[in-house]
Amino acid sequence: MAFVSLLTILLAISSSSVALTEPVASMADQGVFPEQHGRGHHGVFPEEHGRGHHRGGREEEREENPYVFHSDRFRIRASSEAGEIRALPNFGEVSELLEGISRYRVTCIEMKPNTVMLPHYIDAKWILYVTGGRGYIAYVQQNELVKRKLEEGDVFGVPSGHTFYLVNNDDHNSLRIASLLRTESTMRGEYEPFYVAGGRNPETVYSAFSDDVLEAAFNTDVQKLEHIFGAHRRGVIFYANEEQIREMMRRGGFSAESTSASEQPKPFNLRNQKPDFENDNGRFTRAGPKDNPFLDSVDVTVGFGVLNPGTMTAPSHNTKATSIAIVMEGEGRIEMACPHLGQEHGWSSPRERGHQDINYERVRARLRTGTVYVVPAGHPITEIASTNGRLEILWFDINTSGNEREFLAGKNNVLQTLEKEVRHLSFNIPRGEEIEEVLQAQKDQVILRGPQRQRRDEPRSSS
């Protein structure tokens, strides 16, 4: 019983919980992920009934779980028969709990085979991750065109205000991109595209200028300008024929004909890098400010993790960074401790009752391909993979300089670092060896065997 009592102290979270009651937020619905082909109105996930706090017989998930997003929260930014761009809303609009990351936006892009995205720039720094397909990106830097090939697993950054375009030169597969924007607009969390080429659909930035200004700027008659700037009506993403695509590829620029262009950053592939951590349960790879100058400029770390079937990440938290995670493939679930939701439910606070009566809400959600979830700094979380297959997760850590990951369980758990006497006094367990037995029972670290595999493979420590 002593062991059970200690385990309860170590792992207890309020019995109240927040569960999803509708399909979880999915960019899979938008075709960002190659294994998802349909885009039905109701998404790809069956409705799940919750077991948390109910109001009127049903949870108000938007109010009580602001950390996981439904597919209907994605907004179409641009759409045509050749592809589309979608974005989550401003995080600050979703909940006051997310105002600290309102400057950041999550977007997704799908471009059908043999398509081009119009040249434009945005008032945001753009970190892209290629979730499927291949193609290339071209952007203007120091009055030169820099072209970089893209393939699945690549990470690349485009500075704010620099004109760029994307090309899918594949004959068969769509180019799919998930990305994070850090907006630079005076309107916090808002970003806009500025098209320097186009016509009627979409309009270009030239449409805002008067005819006489344009005539003078281009030294060209306004009738000819109207013909040029009014011809395109095919949308932001449009088809090109195979010969046009081949000509763009023949034109070169990938090896950079000038010294200044060759010095520009190149994509790096997270999937092909040596893992930062790996054991029998899974692995993860990450790149941050110290590894890439663009990531340094936005203070973001990008990571990619794989959990093998039936495994879990050890409960842990970021000391400083907030994580925005996207499930690339697989199924599972998350559990996260949150003190703020407990306060929203009206539970007593230390000031009200005069003692440290703190309640942690268990935030939980099913994970499927395309689920997006936010993990605020300091919030302990665990991701648990289904026994049916691997769980692959892409994440962006925001405000990552000086951040550390502290593990609350596993061989390297933070309690092991504390002085033994402090551990014994803090848990108020007379026999100190019981505490040490519990803390040393787990031989793995970072990625562990999950609940189902633990029950199947070996008995737990008991006394």
Curated annotation (Swiss-Prot):
According to the record, glycans are attached at N399
Instruction: Report the leader peptide range.
Output: 1-19
Query: What's any GO biological process attached to this entry?
Result: seed development
Q: How does activity depend on temperature?
A: Stable up to 80 degrees Celsius.
Q: Name one Pfam family in it.
A: Cupin_1
Any idea which positions bind Cu cation?
C338, H340, H379
Q: Where is this region: Disordered?
A: 40-64, 252-280
Q: SMART domains, alphabetically?
A: Cupin_1
Location of the Cupin type-1 domain:
74-226, 268-435
Q: Which UniProt keywords apply?
A: Allergen, Copper, Glycoprotein, Metal-binding, Seed storage protein, Signal, Storage protein
Q: Where does tissue-level expression of this protein occur?
A: Expressed in seed.
Q: Where is this site: Cleavage?
A: R55, G56, S260, A261, R353, G354
Molecular function GO terms recorded: copper ion binding; nutrient reservoir activity
Q: Which CDD domains match?
A: cupin_7S_vicilin-like_C (cd02245), cupin_7S_vicilin-like_N (cd02244)
- What does the similarity note say? Belongs to the 7S seed storage protein family.
Provide the function of this protein.
Seed storage protein.
Subunit relationships: Homotrimer.
Q: What is this protein called?
A: Vicilin Pin k 2.0101
Q: What species is given as this protein's source?
A: Pinus koraiensis (Korean pine)
